Amino acid sequence: MSQLQVRHDWKREEIEALFALPMNDLLFKAHSIHREVYDPNEVQISRLLSIKTGACPEDCKYCPQSARYDTGLEKERLLAMETVLTEARSAKAAGASRFCMGAAWRNPKEKDMPYLKQMVQEVKALGMETCMTLGMLSAEQANELADAGLDYYNHNLDTSPEYYGDVITTRTYQNRLDTLTHVRASGMKVCSGGIVGMGEKATDRAGLLQQLANLPQHPDSVPINMLVKVAGTPFEKLDDLDPLEFVRTIAVARILMPLSRVRLSAGRENMSDELQAMCFFAGANSIFYGCKLLTTPNPEESDDMGLFRRLGLRPEQGAVATLDDEQAVLAKAAAHQDKSTAQFYDAAAL
C-alpha cells in the first residue's frame, strides 16, 4: 500500500512523532515514498555561483558574508557577464542541469534588475535551468525575473518561527514568507529550505519542515543545510549536531514533501561518505556540485563522482520533475508502484 500523501495541514505533533520513530522505521518509510515518485539512483545536480560577494547588511549569525562580522571575507562587486557564463558553461560540461546565482543583498536594487534579467537569459541560452537567490523580492521584481525566464528562486526560511529571532533580527519571518508568496504568484518555482545545527531544538527542526510542508504549494526544491561554522560569526563555536539527526531531517522532509526535490546542501564537505549515503537513502536526490558553495567549501567534483560510482548513483539527465500537476505525478507514482515496488560588472555598486 502506498504511503505517499500530499498534505498541507501537518500538525507539529505529527511531525515530531515522525522524528521520534526508530531510525530503521523512519528510513523505510521515507525510502518507500521516495521510490514511488523518483528513481532512487538518480540525483539532480546544480551548480551555485556567488555573483556578488560580501558586505551584506543583514545580521544572520551563521553567515560569513554579513558586513557585521569580521570573517576575513573580501567583498566583491557584481560579476561580469562573461565570468558568469564561463562558470555556467563549465557547470554544464561537468553534468549540472541547473545553474544557481547568489548575491549577498538584502534585496536587489532596481538599477541592477536589467543586468540580472540579461544574466538569466544568457544562462538559459546555454540550455540550463536557472535559479537565483538575491534576498527579498517585491511582487514587481518577482514578475520581472519570471518574465525574463528565471525558472527557480531560492529564499530559505532558515529555521522555525520560534527560533528565528535567535538567528536573525534584520528580516522578519513574515518577510521571508512574503517573498515566497511573490515568487509563487509570478509563476516561478520555489526553492526553500533551512539550516540545521544552529543550536536549535528538535522541535525547531520539526517546525521548519512544518512551515515548508504547509505552504500553499510545496517548494519544488527543499535544500537542507548543515551549519558550516565560520570563524568570526556568532555561531562559530556551537556544538556539532548529531549526524543522525541530520539524516532524520532529510527523511522527514521526504515524507512531508514527497514530490519535492530534497537537496543535500551545505555542509557536505564535513560529512563522511557513509553519512551522505544514508541521506540519499533517506530521500535526498539533489546536490550542489563544485568545490565552493558561495563562500563555503564543498566536496571536489571528482570526490562526488567517485561517491556516485561507489553507490551506483548517476546524475539526472534532461528536464526535472515539477509540482505543476500533483495529480499527474501521483498517478505516475501509482503506476510505478504497480510495475515495481573581465571579472566584474562595472556599473554595479555595493
Curated annotation (Swiss-Prot):
It catalyses: (4R,5S)-dethiobiotin + (sulfur carrier)-SH + 2 reduced [2Fe-2S]-[ferredoxin] + 2 S-adenosyl-L-methionine = (sulfur carrier)-H + biotin + 2 5'-deoxyadenosine + 2 L-methionine + 2 oxidized [2Fe-2S]-[ferredoxin]. SUPFAM superfamilies: Radical SAM enzymes (SSF102114). GO terms for molecular function: 2 iron, 2 sulfur cluster binding; 4 iron, 4 sulfur cluster binding; biotin synthase activity; iron ion binding. Keywords: 2Fe-2S, 4Fe-4S, Biotin biosynthesis, Iron, Iron-sulfur, Metal-binding, S-adenosyl-L-methionine, Transferase. [4Fe-4S] cluster binds at residues 56, 60, 63. Residues 41-268 form the Radical SAM core domain. Homodimer. This is Biotin synthase. It comes from Shewanella sp. (strain W3-18-1).
